[in-house]
Regions:
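Active-site-facing substrate-recognition patch
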Residues: 1-42
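Phosphate/pyrophosphate-binding loops at sites that engage ATP/ADP/AMP, CoA/4′-phosphopantetheine
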Residues: 36-45, 112-118
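Solvent-exposed alpha-helices and their adjacent loops that cap or buttress functional pockets
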Residues: 40, 87-91, 117-119, 138-139
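Short glycine-rich phosphate-binding loop at a beta-alpha junction
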Residues: 43-53, 124-127
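A short, small-residue-rich loop immediately preceding and capping a beta-strand
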Residues: 44-50, 93-100
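Short, glycine/charge-rich flexible loops or terminal/linker lids adjacent to PRPP-binding catalytic cores
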Residues: 59-96, 104-109
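PRPP-dependent phosphoribosyltransferase catalytic core
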Residues: 114-161
Length: 161
């Protein structure tokens, strides 16, 4: 979609990739679950996804791989348990962290920090679409492996920023 958009990172963009179009379509979500499951090695014990965009993706990957999954919150809630991680994350767990669209990698790096602070390890971060605006460099620079199922180039999006 073309226009003038402000992204979560705070950056402005001339195009918008609507993640909800692929996250709310069962056939596409199932296919993405299979793609994510290809990254689940024997040592991976959990799938992780940050709210909101990573939740459906982590569930799809978990169903395809047979691994349990956790939701990493963006912030503590003032009600209920107030936990940052929903589901069971234990010290020593090895997590495949999935992401919808990566721009700078900020949200997924915040989620990775929460996982590591809990005593678990992030094996790899995999996103559906890399906008090619610094996410890979930031994620790899922070010491994590990173892969994208698709990039903006695969979608035929030219630089417009």
């Amino acid at each position: 979609m073309e226009g003038d958009f402000v992204l979560r990172s705070g950056k402005r963009s001339k195009y918008y990739l609507d993640k909800y179009l692929f996250e709310t379509c069962p056939d596409i979500l199932k296919a993405l679950g299979k793609e994510f499951a290809r990254h689940v090695s024997d040592d991976v014990t959990l799938i992780g996804g940050a709210e909101l965009g990573g939740v459906a993706l982590a569930a799809a990957a978990a169903m395809e791989s047979g691994r349990n999954w956790v939701i990493i919150r963006n912030s503590k809630k003032g009600y209920g348990t107030g936990k940052m991680v929903e589901g069971v994350l234990k010290p020593g767990d090895v997590v495949l962290l999935v992401e919808d669209i990566a721009t700078t990698g900020g949200q997924v790096l915040e989620a990775a920090k929460i996982i590591t602070e809990a005593g678990a390890t992030v094996k790899k971060i995999v996103c559906v679409i890399d906008r090619k605006q610094g996410a890979e460099e930031n994620i790899v620079g922070a010491g994590y492996k990173f892969e994208a199922i698709l990039t903006k180039n695969d979608l035929g999006i030219k630089d417009r920023l």
